[in-house]
Amino acid sequence: MSAKTDEILDSLKSLSLLEASELVKQIEEAFGVSAAASAGVVMAAPGAAAGGDGADAAEEKTEFEVVLESFDASSKIKVLKEVRNATGLGLGEAKALVEAAPKTIKEGATKEDAEALKKAIEAVGGKVTLK
């Protein structure tokens, strides 16, 4: 590999999960592509090959996205603590995530985990939606 590609690879290795997610979104916007489109096609193929009914699979969602929509200004610190507990992010990263609301705080969560996180954040003054 060239020195330039080695440098880019080293930079990518040092990104946090939040930074990597933001990078993917920026790449999708800049190049007009979607990283999720390929995964959706691959995931649909096994169900179709097995002869399963696609409608049943679409009705029962197994992974959820937890989105912090907003929060009471007086509850910012409490919401920040809940986000840190749920994501394992550092203080600065969690603060940036909370202040950027509406923002996805957890992806690929089970229904139980997503609902528990929603309940915990709403209990301290945040508004959360599940997608």
Curated annotation (Swiss-Prot):
Q: List the Pfam families hit by this protein, alphabetically.
A: Ribosomal_L12 (PF00542), Ribosomal_L12_N (PF16320)
Any one Gene Ontology MF annotation carried by this entry is: mRNA binding
GO CC aspect terms: cytosolic large ribosomal subunit
InterPro entries in UniProt: Ribosomal_bL12, Ribosomal_bL12_C, Ribosomal_bL12_C/ClpS-like, Ribosomal_bL12_oligo, Ribosomal_bL12_oligo_N_sf
Q: Does the keyword Ribonucleoprotein apply?
A: yes
Instruction: Give UniProt keywords alphabetically.
Output: Ribonucleoprotein, Ribosomal protein
What CDD domains does its record include?
A: Ribosomal_L7_L12
Question: Is Protease set as a keyword in this record?
Answer: no
Where does the source fall among the domains of life? Bacteria
Single GO biological process annotation from the record: translation
**What does this gene product do?**
Forms part of the ribosomal stalk which helps the ribosome interact with GTP-bound translation factors. Is thus essential for accurate translation.
HAMAP family per UniProt: Ribosomal_bL12
The entry describes its oligomerization and partners as: Homodimer. Part of the ribosomal stalk of the 50S ribosomal subunit. Forms a multimeric L10(L12)X complex, where L10 forms an elongated spine to which 2 to 4 L12 dimers bind in a sequential fashion. Binds GTP-bound translation factors.
Q: Which protein family is it in?
A: Belongs to the bacterial ribosomal protein bL12 family.
The entry's protein name is Large ribosomal subunit protein bL12
**Organism encoding this protein:** Prochlorococcus marinus (strain NATL1A)
Q: Name the gene.
A: rplL
